[in-house]
Amino acid sequence: EHRAFTFSRILYESDRREPGGQGWYTDYPTADQNLMIRLSEMTTTKVGFDKYDEPDHVVLRLTDEKLFDYPFIFMSDVGTLWLDDLEASRLGDYLRKGGFLWVDDFWGPHAWTQWMTQIGKALPSGEYPVFDIPFEHPIHRVVYTVNEIPQIPSIQHWRRSGGRTTSERGRRSEEV
């Protein structure tokens, strides 16, 4: 029997504060719960629910003994991420052993540089280069056909801008 999918968010330290950013807890816990509900509604993935009938989700540190119990982990707003040596080593081990990491919700060239520096501690870029997945790749058609890859703004930015732009962090953040 397969166990139910549990959304696993990583708690991490930030190296600075950022206007509008909230670090690891950006949109927590509602985003985690909503994603799990939609996953159960739109796919055949079995999702776990707790005793209050809320989607099961956990918050872990990279140093947590249970990290390797979860094949999928999520990190939000990684443009302020700071990994110490032990955390970087654990993340690298997790990924090399087949763990899946989804990162989301960071904007602009400064945040991208910060992320690349930190992930480079876990997976050196010479051995593990980061690259864009070509639009023609089958991953864009596994469950649904993806016709375009838009930049999705935060709901707060959408409200503030009246839906005029997706850029939270300046004109170049739409490209990075």
Regions found by a protein language model. Give the residues of each.
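Hydrophobic/aromatic-lined pockets within catalytic cores
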Residues: S40, G99, G120-P124
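An acidic, glycine-rich "communication" segment
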Residues: D15-P19, H110-V176
